[in-house]
Regions:
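Amphipathic alpha-helical substructures
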Residues: 181-274, 386-410, 632, 646-655, ...
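Hydrophobic helix-coil surface modules that form long, contiguous segments used
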Residues: 1-108, 137, 357-358
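Long, ordered, helix-rich scaffold segments
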Residues: 162, 189-190, 331-691
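Beta-strand-rich binding/interaction modules
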Residues: 244-246, 255-341, 458, 462
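Active-site-adjacent bridging/hinge elements
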Residues: 18-23, 81-82, 105-115, 165-180, ...
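Conserved hydrophobic/aromatic pocket- or pore-lining residues that grip, position, or stack substrates
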Residues: 50, 83, 113, 135, ...
């Protein structure tokens, strides 16, 4: 790669384990070079981490990074990395904590391609995941090492379930290693990247860190400076780790998200229990073969204390599920136990297991694995919403909600022990996660129930929410250390709940945060929270924010995103108006994703408005974008590809727009391929988990 222009530079050195000094230089426009320090420091950190974690030293004397401000491009060119400005520039005044995380993840990903992508690359397009899935796994490991591993894992799985699980369940389902493709751009999918990363992670779980490292070292030794296949990666991991991965390789060839059913039959008199597991691979033609599924598991007693999990062969940490049906006999159980399954999300599967609301609340309070603790809470929240949405329910259904409300109070009381994890444990799953549990889901009814449950929980814990909100205030200059960032995150979660109570004081506080809050994280979070409510404070906050930051394009993306995610009625029309305004440019990829990506991908309530306005708007946008940047259309259509999963009226309205797009002359091959898939593919049910 080559780049030329009137760039300013900022440089530093990294000294590797052999004592060699490597010059790192970031190039950007003069007006933005001051915002590149975090990027430069990230490059130093990822270089050091890759050498320590995987033994991969940088192989040149210098590394150049170009901040691209005019094109939507991030590339891992050897020695000259290109990064979009949206994923490269950050400063304490105008960037949120999430912006810093994004810079770290994207910059880390592109650097890590030096070994998994450049020195060892993929042989052909069908092997894309050997490069992208492996590197995505590595960038996740890097990000986890730089922050809270539990929170990073929760964030990763939340995104996986929202995007990739939906892809697996809809018209766009395809294997990680596809057998064919119509347009190359359609290969750059959540399945290839994110499910591909989860497959590598499963190998890591099965082998353990030391054997996995030996296998990856062997992979580099065998294939350095060579194009490779997925099979060659698996063979190196198997040979280096001393495992047979023949069955494991099926993960790359079978589409869909597997479902694992777990049942515990306990015999108190004999102090034993039968752990029964079955797996179901949702392949349309029933040709799916049993997969190798590593499930991290554990047991908790009735008071929340860990109980050793073992059989006649010894302690069990990971259950290696290889058969369609498998039974394990557990021994030495002196009390009734609750099963904690898929800790750390060790396998990308849906787990179905019978657990009461009280069991889930106990796990939410006492589980030692951060991810499993969060997952139990998400299940309890989903149950509460589903119970409230039942047509014969009068008011809020008490049973799951009572357990949730009490656990919520305990979480707030104990939140100071780990602000970052507490913020995740208290956060509700979005409406789409609830809708995925129901055939022919009525999103409008579920949205009403979702709001009712959140409002009930907030009102029942009003004083504790205010106490936690005020305790997380940090005086003095803005700090980027993990503790300060965690306090800001928890404070924002509390404010979001406080606004649900329709309290004038909460609205006034949120407006004050927008007007004079310390840092962009605080201001942006308050703006996003206010935008869900049709009130004077919302209008004032939007006006103040726009006037203050109108000259800062990256900050104004936050302003656009806040409105795109708004829950109150008429969202499609408001977003359409913004998209037609002079300030918006569809060809500007970061701006388009902030407004349109947020609305079409994330706003389940506004997009699925009963009048079909969201669907018509999406079809218009896809046809317009297809003429400008056809490779980008697929990123806006995940919800449209799930059109069969909603109630009859919404499904019909979505199908009408799909047929309109498909019947339009001159559309690109990529868009035509996706519309053909949408109309031809059957429905694959993929509930997120039932307990």
């Amino acid at each position: 790669a080559i780049a030329a222009g009137p760039y300013a530079q900022v440089s530093d050195h990294h000294v590797d384990g052999a004592g060699r000094s490597i010059l790192i230089t970031v190039h950007a426009s003069a007006g933005n070079i001051a915002r590149c320090r975090f990027l430069l420091d990230t490059m130093k950190r990822v270089m050091a981490w890759d050498e320590e974690a995987f033994g991969r030293r940088y192989d040149l004397d210098c590394l150049n990074v170009l901040v691209v401000e005019t094109h939507a491009i991030s590339q891992e060119n050897k020695g000259l990395i290109f990064l979009e400005a949206a994923y490269a520039l950050a400063d304490a005044e105008t960037s949120t904590d999430e912006d810093f995380d994004l810079v770290e993840r994207i910059a880390g990903h592109e650097y890590l391609h030096n070994w998994t992508g450049n020195r060892v690359t993929c042989r052909d397009w069908f092997q894309l995941s050997v490069k992208e899935g492996l590197t995505r796994f590595r960038d996740q490991m890097f990000s986890a090492a730089m922050s809270s591993p539990d929170v990073k894992r929760i964030t990763t799985v939340r995104n996986l379930r929202t995007n990739q699980f939906a892809e697996d369940a809809g018209a766009g389902a395809h294997p990680v290693q596809p057998k064919s493709y119509g347009a190359v751009s359609n290969l750059y999918s959540g399945t290839v990247y994110d499910k591909g990363a989860e497959i590598v992670r499963m190998a890591y779980v099965l082998l353990g860190s030391e054997r996995f490292r030996r296998g990856l070292d062997l992979f580099f030794a065998r294939h350095d400076l060579s194009p490779v296949t997925i099979e060659q990666l698996l063979q190196a991991l198997a040979d280096g780790g001393g495992e047979d991965f023949a069955q494991f390789a099926r993960w790359y060839h079978q589409p869909g998200t597997p479902r694992v059913h777990v049942r515990l039959r306990q015999d108190p008199d004999r102090r034993i229990a039968r752990l029964e597991l079955t797996q179901d691979v949702p392949v349309e033609d029933k040709s799916g073969m049993p997969l190798r599924v590593p499930l991290r598991m554990g047991l908790l007693g009735k008071h929340g204390r860990p109980v050793p999990m073992k059989n006649e062969e010894g302690p069990i940490d990971v259950v290696d599920l290889t058969e369609a049906e498998q039974v394990i006999e557990l021994q030495d159980l002196d009390e009734s136990v609750i099963v904690s399954c898929n800790r750390g999300f060790s396998a990308p599967v849906v787990v179905e297991i019978e657990r009461s609301s009280e069991d889930l609340a106990l796990l939410l309070r006492h589980e030692t694995d951060g991810f499993a603790r969060w997952d139990a809470g998400q299940e309890l929240m989903v149950r509460s919403v589903l119970a409230q949405a039942e047509p014969d329910g009068a008011g809020v259904s008490p049973r799951p909600l009572e357990a949730l409300t009490a656990a919520f109070a305990d979480l707030l009381q104990a939140s100071s022990a780990d602000h970052a994890l507490a913020a995740e444990l208290l956060s509700f799953p979005h409406v789409g996660m609830v809708a995925e549990r129901i055939d022919e889901a009525d999103v409008g009814k579920l949205a009403t129930a979702w709001i009712d449950v959140r409002r009930h929980v907030a009102a029942a814990n009003l004083n504790a929410l205010w106490t936690t909100f005020h305790s997380c205030r940090a005086p003095g200059p803005i700090s980027l250390d993990p503790a300060a960032r965690a306090r800001r995150r928890l404070r924002s979660v509390c404010l979001d709940y406080l606004l649900e109570t329709d309290d004038h004081t909460a609205r006034a506080v949120a407006l004050a945060e927008v007007e004079a809050g310390a840092g962009m994280t605080t201001q942006s979070a308050a703006l996003h929270a206010l935008c869900h409510f049709d009130c004077n404070e919302r209008d004032r906050a939007l006006d103040v924010f726009q006037k203050r930051w109108s000259e800062k394009a990256d900050v104004m993306r936050l302003w656009l995103r806040a409105q795109a995610l708004s829950r109150f009625p008429g969202a499609a029309d408001r977003v359409r108006t913004l998209a037609a305004s002079p300030m918006f440019n569809l060809a500007n990829a970061p701006q388009a994703m902030a407004l349109l990506g947020s609305f079409f991908r994330q706003n389940r309530i506004g997009f699925h408005a009963s009048d079909g306005s969201g669907y018509r708007f999406l079809a218009d946008t896809l046809l317009q974008l297809d003429r400008i940047r056809p490779q980008s259309t697929r990123w806006l259509m995940p919800q449209l590809m799930l059109w069969r999963r909603f109630d009859a009226d919404r499904s019909a309205k979505m199908k009408e727009q799909i047929m309109r797009i498909a019947g339009t002359e001159g559309i690109s091959a990529a868009l035509a391929e996706n519309m053909a898939r949408a109309l031809a593919a059957p429905l694959l049910r993929q509930e997120q988990g039932r307990s």
